[in-house]
Amino acid sequence: MSKNGGEMIVKQETLKLPLKDADKVIAHIVNGIRTSFESIFTRTTAGGLKGLKKGANASMPFIFEKEGMKIALVESDWTEYPGLRIHYPKDADSPRALFAPVPKKLVQKGNQLQPSEVEDYIAKTSGTREFPWRAFIVARDDKVLADNDTVYKLASESKIGDASWITPGSSVWDWWVNWNTKGVDFKCGFNEQMCKYYVDFAADNDIPYITLDAGWHVGR
């Protein structure tokens, strides 16, 4: 926690994991900072991370074995701050933390805004704030990790006063059908007519939700 007041610039965080190259890890490996977090978790070794192509890293949770124990590195209560990643630079002796720098200039690429220039720091934030939790969950086998609620317990309380109206249910999903349909009198695509059509379709078929996927903020 920081109580300095005003605005604060965080240059970097340091975290070095005490792993040997032969230690087993389970990692969600992605290529670069920008990712949709949809990769398959990979069973490899700490040394295997060193052989990945430049820019590759692992997002949380990062799981490794040490002295017969299963250990999951996780984070919680993460707001206005870059998420923790793990990478293994070729000139390093063990895996360590990696954080996305703050974008300095953004450019439009397709339906995304991507940084073309970055700052030399990872966060510009309030000087009075709590920082994200970094935690190690230790277990004797994998199923204990799956049943652990450390991330939930470390998180801030819900900002929603009454969440009883939030319930699971089916949804019409525009991206899954590639913004497409048949028998309509307008051009299919990510446009207002298509969104209205999906809303009407959901209502007519008692589907409680509609999902507006990637590109909604700038158009497809």
Residue ranges and their predicted role:
Residues M1-S158:
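N-terminal accessory beta-strand-rich subdomains and adjacent acidic, glycine-rich linkers
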Residues D162:
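Conserved catalytic cores of very large enzyme subunits
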Residues V172-R220:
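Aromatic-lined carbohydrate-binding/catalytic grooves of carbohydrate-active enzymes
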Residues T167:
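Phosphate/adenylate-binding glycine loop and adjacent helical scaffold
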